[in-house]
């Protein structure tokens, strides 16, 4: 059974897609791609709730690399995510947690960061769920970049890459909108949880893959999968005052420092946002991969976290059709975005066949 959007591709775009496929030639199916992606996991940052007899539960964020638990402030809010059966943390304003070890990543090699966030029914004014990387090129550490989502009542529309302008120290921040914020979601029920993969490559690019799951008939998961590539990675590109007329000169990042969870403030600098924020609305965890994930590896890893009969390693993002013309397959079905195939039972039994040439 064939499912997906169908559109016509010019030869130049097909060549580009073919080049991307050759880079990911090391894996070709769900099993192989999951194995290669899992081998790149170097660190996880996971919220934990530990019951304490005769007292309130203790809240921690567990760092797998340092094998340590970081205590969060007593005023941290908890939101239980029934879709994932996990607890998300909303840190109080101006709060952040710095990991005790240097991040085990290299800008020269590239890396991927996965954020898991609960956004539906979990929004706060001026909120922004963020994870940042500190530079250790001077005694005054500063934020090199921050990652996260600015949630709204329809959280899947508001995923951002947040980058900080750099001088001697970062003083200001700007939001980059990676895709059309008015994209329609699938016609099922938005599950309220989002998985966002930020893949940094040595050429100074960051690829963002956002998966927002929707449920059908209380059993089947379908994804709204959006993707964008931005100049927001390493080396970092700051803009002078005013509208830029060409590509700015790169700024040397310096040595990699620790991660900062929350990013409402950093040592030796002013807060990166103009107003105080609740640092982590809906933070369910972060996974750091020590090397960049290919598109197929991202899909395979996501399927291992929340499997879907409508997501296959040979597919392309749902928003591909906005920029390409040709015949491709996405997880968003054949009708309006997100509609599953009409015969769900047959898909459940036989999975999906695709017609994507990569």
Swiss-Prot record:
A lipid is attached at residue 16 (N-palmitoyl cysteine). A lipid is attached at residue 16 (S-diacylglycerol cysteine). It comes from the Bacteria. It is a lipid-anchor. This is Uncharacterized lipoprotein y4eE. One of its GO terms (cellular component) is plasma membrane. Residues 347-358 have a biased composition (Polar residues). Residues 331-358 are annotated as: Disordered. The keyword Metal-binding does not apply. Residues 1-15 form the signal peptide. Transmembrane segments: none annotated. Keywords: Cell membrane, Lipoprotein, Membrane, Palmitate, Plasmid, Signal. It is found in: Cell membrane.
């Amino acid at each position: 059974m064939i499912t997906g959007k169908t559109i016509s591709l010019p030869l130049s775009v097909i060549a580009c897609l073919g080049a991307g496929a050759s880079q990911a030639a090391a894996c070709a199916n769900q099993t192989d791609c999951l194995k290669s992606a899992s081998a790149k996991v170097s660190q996880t940052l996971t919220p934990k709730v530990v019951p304490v007899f005769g007292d309130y539960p203790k809240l921690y964020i567990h760092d797998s690399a340092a094998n340590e638990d970081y205590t969060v402030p007593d005023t941290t809010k908890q939101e239980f995510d029934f879709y994932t059966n996990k607890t998300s943390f909303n840190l109080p304003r101006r709060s952040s947690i710095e990991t005790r070890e240097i991040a085990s990543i290299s800008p020269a090699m590239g890396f991927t960061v996965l954020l898991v966030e609960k956004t539906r029914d979990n929004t706060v004014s001026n909120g922004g769920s963020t994870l940042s990387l500190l530079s250790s090129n001077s005694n005054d550490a500063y934020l090199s970049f921050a990652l996260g989502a600015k949630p709204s009542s329809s959280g899947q529309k508001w995923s951002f890459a947040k980058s900080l302008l750099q001088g001697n120290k970062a003083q200001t921040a700007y939001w980059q909108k990676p895709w059309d914020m008015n994209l329609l979601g699938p016609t099922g029920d938005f599950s309220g949880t989002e998985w966002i993969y930020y893949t940094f490559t040595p050429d100074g690019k960051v690829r963002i893959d956002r998966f927002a799951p929707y449920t059908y008939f209380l059993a089947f998961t379908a994804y709204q999968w959006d993707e964008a590539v931005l100049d927001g990675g390493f080396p970092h590109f700051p803009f002078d005052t005013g509208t830029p007329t060409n590509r700015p000169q790169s700024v040397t990042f310096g040595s990699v420092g620790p991660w900062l969870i929350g990013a409402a403030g950093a040592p030796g600098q002013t807060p990166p946002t103009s107003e105080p924020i609740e640092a982590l609305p809906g933070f369910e965890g972060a996974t750091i991969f020590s090397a960049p994930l290919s598109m197929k590896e991202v899909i395979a890893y996501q399927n291992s976290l929340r499997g879907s009969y409508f997501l296959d390693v040979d597919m392309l993002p749902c928003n591909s059709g906005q920029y390409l013309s040709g015949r491709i397959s996405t997880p968003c079905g054949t009708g309006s975005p997100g509609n599953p195939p009409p015969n769900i039972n047959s898909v459940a039994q036989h999975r999906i066949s695709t017609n994507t040439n990569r």
